[in-house]
Design a protein with these regions (language model features):
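N-terminal secretory signal peptides that target proteins for export/translocation
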Residues: 1-3
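Bacterial N-terminal signal peptides
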Residues: 6-16
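Short, surface-exposed loop and linker segments with low hydrophobicity and enrichment for Pro/Ser/Thr
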Residues: 15-25, 51-53, 87, 184-205
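N-terminal cleavable signal peptides for secretion/export
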Residues: 19-74
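Residues at beta-strand starts and edge strands
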Residues: 24-28, 42-44, 55-59, 77-79, ...
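A generic short-segment signal for beta-strand/edge and adjacent turn/coil regions
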Residues: 28-33, 49-51, 62-63, 75-78, ...
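Hydrophobic/aromatic-rich structural module bridging two neighboring secondary-structure elements via a short loop
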Residues: 61-115
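Mature, soluble, non-transmembrane domains
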Residues: 93-205
Length: 205
């Protein structure tokens, strides 16, 4: 699975002795377009909402798209994720909808006895149970890992990450920092976006 991620933003915490970068609670809203051209068609939106309390991280993601395959045939896809993550576990509920037909997915990934075990239920099917490779990162931990490596000036690196939304399994991503000049500029019709203070990196994954 490969996709272009044009921008990765991280708030940076600075200690008196050294710079330490880590993920911070945040909300991000995206416009999804088909392709990188300046006139690429808009096909949907995505909202990423990450909060934290004493119980751990809470990640919500809401993705909605509509793609016109022909003049008379459109495909609408939606994915709504709600999840909780601690150092040792990731629990989530996911509703995926295609052309108005919903499918529920519930899952848990947890460290047990030195192993990382997944237990996932797709709709009414029996639970899928399997063991993930030891280096697998949970979603919020994966963001932290990317920030740490980029802040350490790593230009390119791999990472194993559990993906609850597309495949419900682990996949390998290759992260490469890009030249900032490669970022597509904002369109005149787009509303202005002001980034919060902090470090940012354009990357390809």
């Amino acid at each position: 699975m490969r996709s272009i991620v044009s921008f990765l933003f991280a708030a940076v915490l600075l200690s008196p002795l050294a710079a330490v970068a880590q993920v911070q609670p945040h909300r991000a809203e995206y416009t999804l377009r088909l392709g990188a051209a300046a006139n690429a068609a808009r096909i949907g939106t995505a909202v990423h909402d990450l909060t934290q309390d004493c119980a751990g991280w809470h990640l919500k993601r809401d993705i909605r798209t509509e793609i016109a395959l022909t003049a008379s045939w459109k495909m609408s896809l939606a994915s709504k994720l709600e999840s909780d993550e601690t150092r040792n576990a990731f629990r989530y509920g996911l509703v995926q909808t295609q052309n108005g037909n919903p499918r529920d997915v519930k899952g848990k990934v947890q460290k047990q006895g030195g192993e990382l075990k997944a237990d996932i239920v797709f709709g009414t099917s029996p639970p899928a149970q399997f063991v993930l490779p030891p280096p697998t990162l949970l979603p919020v931990a994966a963001i932290n890992h990317l920030i740490e490596r980029l802040n350490a000036k790593a230009a390119s690196f791999p990472a194993l990450m559990f993906d609850p939304e597309v495949i419900g399994d682990v996949f390998l991503i290759e992260v490469t920092e890009q030249d900032r000049a490669m970022l597509r500029g904002a369109r005149p019709a787009d509303k202005p976006v002001t980034l919060p203070p902090g470090q940012s990196w354009p990357v390809f994954m």
